[in-house]
Amino acid sequence: MLHTLCTDGKCPSKADGWGRGTATFRILGDICTRSCKFCATKSGRPLPPDPNEPAEVAESIRLMGLKYAVITSVDRDDLPDGGAAHWAATVRAIKEVNPDTIVEVLIPDFDGRTDLLDVVITSRPDVIGHNIETVERITPLVRSRAQYRRSLEVLRYIASQGAVAKSGLMLGLG
């Protein structure tokens, strides 16, 4: 089953986004291994990754005629590679089926492991995002396993590899 944040997140701008040729897909299931205070995603023990998901996401993007696709995921701390290989397979599948679609990935921190970041980077997404979410002072209160400085290092590493790095903050959390 494919998941989009447009639908699962009840996005009020879904029609506008889809009309402009953009959508956000969530891969690796709908159950997160973390339980961040700001997020409404279910947490617990997720199912194994669906090996058909990369091809299904790529085909959905083709059928929707998307010009810009954003891929995000739940955190998968239960997997030895945090889902990095699945991320890379998804990017490669999208690029193969939709060579003109811009692919932005919004990745977890992979516990700061550069070997896992490299797996995603070498799949060649157009933009690699990792959200810091909030200021350093309240990070421990709202992000269950994340570390502010580790997130900065993740972004620094992505940029040092020549990739376009992007981040986001939520307003109103301190």
Task: Please tell me what each predicted stretch does.
Residues 1-15:
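An N-cap/entry alpha-helix motif that binds or orients negatively charged groups
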Residues 20-127, 134-138, 148-160, 167:
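Conserved Radical SAM active-site core
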Residues 142-146:
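Short, surface-exposed, charged loop/turn segments at secondary-structure junctions
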Residues 168-173:
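Short, glycine/charged-rich beta-strand-loop motifs at protein surfaces that mediate ligand recognition
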